[in-house]
Amino acid sequence: AIRIPRAVVCLISALAHHGLTTQVPHTVDLALPSHAQIPKIDGVPLRVFWYSEPSLSAGIEVVTIDGVSVRIYSPEKTVADCFKYRNKIGLDVAIEALRTYRERTPKPNFQALAKFAQINRVQRVMRPYLEAVL
């Protein structure tokens, strides 16, 4: 986080942080602005995804991990991102994230999910899955 200040933890890494997946992250998934250079950090396997605005800046939370402030996407934004990048991470991961979000969140915010789906332009993709879990 200190070496890459514009990066935001996303996808599988964010799902794992929020407890929304059974997947074990083997890399740290980072969102960077379009056309940013790929950072190199020794000993840390990174997987970079390029985001454009407004998707990059939407839904960011700041959490403290080991005394360091880390930018990470909210659970709702992460679920929408999983559907956007379903061809890279797998549709099964996206569906599992949505189902787990609904089951483990005391008050699921489906309006926020719909907002982030619209920002990511995946409303049509997510709609049948949202209807199935409601």
Describe each model-derived feature in a short phrase.
Residues 1-134:
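Nucleic-acid-binding surface
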